[in-house]
């Protein structure tokens, strides 16, 4: 099931090709804070695996690193880089609870996984 939650006053980035109505109510996973911008916090179990973020460095499991989604045109893609050219703001948390998240945000995002 796909659900859409809206926070703040976003503008249409045209990232979604299908019109999805906004879901009312509380987000079912983790906590949302808007005190200092937007923050999503989810406490993972020890065995949870996180997939996604497109062309991000490191291995397939994204746990244990801080990724910055901020399109840069840096020709040196090394392990210590936190941001690469593409911004693919989609993750899947697989474990006790399994769910996916897409953050439709056209500016800098930090994923501290």
What are these regions (language model features)?
Residues 1-113:
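Catalytic and substrate-binding clefts that recognize carbohydrates or anionic sugar/phosphate headgroups
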